[in-house]
């Protein structure tokens, strides 16, 4: 599982890893938030209504879910279990709470936290995305500082200063984990 603060680069890193490793899969999560520019339903997220989210939650379709920043996000249970059953490595994009929950259910899960090079760089990235107003950026920045304080709950940390180097470091972790004696 890969976690990072908003603007930390986790989505871009995961997309690049998926292109480089054919055994890696990333089940598409569900969300109630509206799509951002260039996001497509079914590729980036399954964009659903709050009512649909509640229906699926009641039905047990989600492995875990959270509600950061007022919008709901969930990890699809069936897609993950199907991928694991086929021997695929699953990479998930989760917040700190979701990662902790999944680790309890899947003891062999590997938790990786992607750090920004600095808090100042993170603030600049959040502003540069132009997707949130200053109040929302402030909320995301505050949560990022809180989440970074939980770094000790993760197995690895990767600094995303140089994108190519961060991708290589993530690939190295995935490779090392395949050969780890458990």
Kindly label every feature range from the protein language model.
Residues 2:
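Hydrophobic anchor at the beta1->P-loop junction of P-loop NTPases
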Residues 7-8:
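ATP-binding Walker
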Residues 11:
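Walker A/P-loop
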Residues 14-15:
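The feature captures the helix immediately C-terminal to the Walker
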Residues 18-27:
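Post-Walker A helix-loop "phosphate-sensing" segment adjacent to the P-loop in P-loop NTPases
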Residues 29-90, 97-100:
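ATP-dependent small-molecule kinase phosphotransfer cores
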Residues 90-95, 104-129:
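Conserved phosphate-donor/acceptor-positioning beta-strand/loop module used by diverse small-molecule
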Residues 124, 128-132, 146-182:
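NTP-dependent small-molecule kinase module
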């Amino acid at each position: 599982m890969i976690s990072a603060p908003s603007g930390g680069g986790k989505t871009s890193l995961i997309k690049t890893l998926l292109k480089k490793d054919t055994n890696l899969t990333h089940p598409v999560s569900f969300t109630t938030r509206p799509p951002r520019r260039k996001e497509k339903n079914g590729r980036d997220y399954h964009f659903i209504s709050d009512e649909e989210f509640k229906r699926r939650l009641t039905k047990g379709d989600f492995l875990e879910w959270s509600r950061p920043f007022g919008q709901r996000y969930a990890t699809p249970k069936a897609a993950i279990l199907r991928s694991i059953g086929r021997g695929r490595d699953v990479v998930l994009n989760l917040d700190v709470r979701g990662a902790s929950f999944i680790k309890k259910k899947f003891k062999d899960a590997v938790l990786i936290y992607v750090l920004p090079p600095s808090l100042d760089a993170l603030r600049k990235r959040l502003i540069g995305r132009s997707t949130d107003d200053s109040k929302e950026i402030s909320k995301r920045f505050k949560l990022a500082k809180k989440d970074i304080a939980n770094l000790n709950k993760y197995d690895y940390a990767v600094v995303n200063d140089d994108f190519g180097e961060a991708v290589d470091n993530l690939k190295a972790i995935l490779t090392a984990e395949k050969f780890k004696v458990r």
